[in-house]
C-alpha cells in the first residue's frame, strides 16, 4: 500500500485500539503493518492522531469532527473528517480542502495521479528544499520564514526546518486559525 516507507517507530497498540471503528480499515492496517514513519520520498508522514488532535481541535473549524492521520513536509495536516472525507488543512495559507470522499482511491491517487499531487502537495518545492537543506527528521517540517501570512514569499530562499507542531502553533497564533474567527 505504501511505497518507500521509512519506519520511525511502532504505532502504540492503545492508539490502534482507540481508533478502530473511527478511522477506515486501511488506516488501521497501515498503523499495524507499517507503524509511524514517512513515505512519498519523505513528503508525507504517518502520525499518531493523539499528538495532533488537540492542535487540530483548537485551530481548525472542523477540528472536533477530524482525526489527524498524516502531516506533509510543509506542516499541512491530513485528516479523516465526519467519518467520510479525507481533508487537508493548509495552515501556512490559512486554508483547507477536501481531498477525497472515502479511502477507495486515496493511496493510488497519491502515487499515480499527477493532477492530484499537484493540487494538494508541493513536491517540486519539496525536492528543491531537500537538496538545499537536507532531509527532514520525523518531527520536522519545512517552514516559511517569514510566515506566508505575514508577507513571506513561497520560495526556496524563505524556508527553514522546524518542529512541526511548534510551527503550526506559531502560524495560528500570529496569522490566525483555519476557518475560525477570533
Regions found by a protein language model. Give the residues of each.
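A surface-exposed partner-binding patch
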Residues: 1-88, 140-182
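Mixed-charge (acidic/basic) macromolecular-recognition segments
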Residues: 115-157
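Generic low-complexity, intrinsically disordered sequence content enriched
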Residues: 6, 111, 120, 127-129, ...
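Charged, low-complexity, helix-prone segments enriched in Lys/Glu/Asp/Gln
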Residues: 51-59, 108-110, 123-126
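A sequence-composition feature that detects small, non-aromatic residues
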Residues: 73-75, 100, 129
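Compact, glycine/acidic-enriched structural inserts
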Residues: 87-124
Amino acid at each position: 500500500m505504501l511505497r518507500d516507507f521509512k519506519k520511525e517507530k511502532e504505532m502504540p497498540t492503545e492508539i490502534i485500539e482507540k481508533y478502530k471503528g473511527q478511522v477506515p480499515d486501511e488506516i488501521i492496517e497501515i498503523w499495524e503493518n507499517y507503524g509511524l514513519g514517512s513515505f512519498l520520498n519523505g513528503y508525507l508522514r504517518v502520525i499518531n492522531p493523539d499528538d495532533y488532535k488537540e492542535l487540530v481541535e483548537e485551530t481548525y473549524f472542523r477540528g472536533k469532527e477530524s482525526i489527524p492521520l498524516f502531516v506533509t513536509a510543509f506542516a499541512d495536516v491530513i485528516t479523516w473528517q465526519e467519518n467520510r472525507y479525507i481533508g487537508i488543512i493548509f495552515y501556512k495559507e490559512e486554508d483547507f480542502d477536501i481531498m477525497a470522499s472515502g479511502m477507495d482511491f486515496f493511496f493510488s491517487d497519491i502515487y499515480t495521479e499527477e493532477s492530484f499531487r499537484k493540487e494538494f502537495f508541493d513536491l517540486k518545492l519539496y525536492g528543491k528544499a531537500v537538496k538545499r537543506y537536507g532531509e527532514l527528521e520525523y518531527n520536522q517540517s519545512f517552514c516559511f520564514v517569514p510566515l506566508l501570512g505575514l508577507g513571506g514569499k513561497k520560495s526556496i530562499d524563505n524556508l527553514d526546518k522546524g518542529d512541526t507542531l511548534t510551527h503550526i502553533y506559531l502560524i495560528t497564533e500570529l496569522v490566525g486559525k483555519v476557518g475560525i474567527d477570533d
